Curated annotation (Swiss-Prot):
The keyword Cytoplasm is assigned to this record: yes
E.C. number(s) listed in UniProt: 2.7.7.38
Gene symbol of the encoding locus: kdsB
CDD domains recorded: CMP-KDO-Synthetase (cd02517)
Species this chain originates from: Xanthomonas oryzae pv. oryzae (strain KACC10331 / KXO85)
Domain of life per record: Bacteria
Location(s), subcellular: Cytoplasm
UniProt xrefs under Pfam families: CTP_transf_3
Protein name, UniProt field: 3-deoxy-manno-octulosonate cytidylyltransferase
Amino acid sequence: MTLPPPADFVVAIPARYASKRLPGKPLQRIGNRPMIQHVAERALLAGARAVWVATDDARIAEAIAHLPGVHVAMTGTAHLSGTDRLAECARIAGWDEQTCVVNLQGDEPFAPAAGIGAVADLLQHSGAEMATLAAPVDSAHDLFDPNVVKLVRNARGDALYFSRAPIPWHRDSFASQRDSVPAEGQWLRHIGIYGYRAGFLQRFAAMPPGMLERIESLEQLRVMEAGYRIAVAVTPEPFPPGIDTPDDLARAQARVASA
């Protein structure tokens, strides 16, 4: 059996300084390095042809300027989303429409390299317009936490829906207790890493938000509501959560300190 060749891809990391819940998040130090450096190094380990950091802040650009293989796209300050920022990055970088772009969030300092590469491979071989990852939900807290996005897939592995609500809704189990994950069924949490061709990235950024995106505040629903496919793979190894709050940062710092 001949295995398909690994995907050729670039990684683009949107990074803005003005995070509401954790100001200056990309520059917060984890161990002896800023968070954005950890993320860029994970992308390089994944085998990306190039890594780009898309930012509107010179301090973030300076923090990774010394890393070989990492480029900086200085983007505008008015972008409403990371997708908009990456669309500008793609134009600055001059990627052709078929370039495989993996969008790695700037707050994922422990992203497994295998997971990043898996998104690129899934995009290449699935035929879908977008690709992303999921992981099993292992706690009732995550299942009912609206900050943990859940998803359901069809038999082909394409996303049917993303929601902040616990989906699928277990009618019998959830009616009586919500302190454990039901044994029957599979609940998946979304991991916010995306793969798409550079041409589709431009179309995505140009689409107006749909009703579902406005209700759930989930940008990927814009793609589904417009009728495009999002292929979803279950991550091949545990995927630590990203860093959104000061408590998340403290846990990440403790993890590195104890390693």
